[in-house]
């Protein structure tokens, strides 16, 4: 059975069950008293205040007899919160459409003029991102009209940040070799770092002095900070995360799930038709 989040649902339960107790109290009054109340119009008396202990007892009794109500309340609250989050994310996507889909600073795989776009926020040290790399490759190979944008989003410590600085500098200097660099570093068994990223960069023909000079350019750090800000606005806090159409998709959900969402965007403009 799912665990209950009492901090979320206790206030709701108190209000709901309190109302039930209030109604139950008056429903239990003798029929004669109810009849008298209905026929007596001259005197209007306020109903007696319910004792707090009575309310608490009624709530406790109801919850013990109907514990499934708490799961229903929790599910309803979570669904309401998710709906609000999706609405906020859709608005953020609309407001930041150019920065998300068409930033000239971002590496792009596939067809730069494709009819549909997938945007991925990733970290080179993210295990699920490594697993999801095959999904990207499969989708691009099977869909010549797909544009795949990569958002360098180092969130897993200083090693990740250093590796992404190397990656962005390499992309700026050697854009033709960047796809090989990306696949090799993301597929690397060890930890991505300045050292491992630079080793791959030089093996692909990059000049370390030029790369380090480019890494020192303030624009590299500014681009990463801009990605952090964009992720925050979209409610993205983990990797991998995707933006497809008007939806933020979190987690390595697999090629078939992503491809279905792309197909729906082409068909009706939304990930769900």
Task: Show where each model-derived region lies.
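A short beta-strand-turn-helix
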Residues: 98-116, 140-141, 273
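C-terminal cap of thioredoxin/glutaredoxin-like
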Residues: 2-56, 60, 202-273
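Residue-level marker of structural boundaries
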Residues: 79, 145, 187-190, 220, ...
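Short amphipathic alpha-helical surface patches that mediate protein-protein
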Residues: 64, 75-78, 183-187, 202, ...
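Structural alpha/beta surface segment adjacent to cysteine/selenocysteine redox centers
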Residues: 119, 124, 130-208, 212, ...
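Extracytoplasmic c-type cytochrome modules immediately beyond a signal peptide or single-pass transmembrane anchor
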Residues: 48-101
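Soluble non-cytosolic domains of exported or imported proteins
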Residues: 49-53, 64, 116, 127-130, ...
């Amino acid at each position: 059975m799912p665990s209950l989040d009492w901090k979320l649902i206790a206030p709701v339960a108190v209000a709901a069950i309190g109302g039930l107790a209030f109604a139950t109290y008056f429903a239990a009054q003798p029929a004669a008293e109810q009849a008298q109340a209905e026929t007596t119009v001259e005197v209007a008396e306020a109903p007696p205040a319910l004792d707090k202990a009575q309310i608490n007892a009624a709530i406790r009794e109801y919850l013990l007899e109907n514990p499934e109500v708490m799961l229903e309340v929790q599910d309803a609250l979570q669904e309401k919160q998710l709906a609000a989050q999706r609405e906020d994310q859709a608005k953020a996507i609309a407001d930041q459409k150019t920065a998300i889909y068409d930033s000239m600073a971002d590496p792009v795989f596939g067809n730069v003029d494709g009819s549909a776009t997938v945007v991925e926020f990733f970290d080179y040290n993210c295990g699920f991102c490594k697993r999801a790399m095959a999904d990207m490759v499969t989708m691009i190979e099977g869909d010549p009209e797909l544009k795949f944008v990569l958002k360098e989003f180092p969130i897993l410590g200083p090693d990740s940040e250093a590796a992404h600085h190397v990656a962005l500098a390499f992309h700026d200097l050697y854009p033709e070799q960047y796809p090989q660099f990306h696949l090799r570093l993301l597929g690397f068994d060890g930890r991505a770092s300045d050292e491992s990223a630079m080793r791959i960069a030089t093996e692909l023909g990059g000049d370390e002095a030029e790369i380090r000079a480019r890494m020192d350019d303030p624009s590299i750090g500014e681009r990463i900070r801009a990605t952090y800000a964009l992720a925050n606005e979209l409610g993205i806090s983990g990797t991998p995360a995707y933006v497809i159409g008007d939806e933020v998709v979190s987690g390595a959900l697999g090629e078939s799930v992503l491809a279905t969402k792309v197909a729906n965007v082409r068909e009706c403009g939304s990930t769900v038709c």
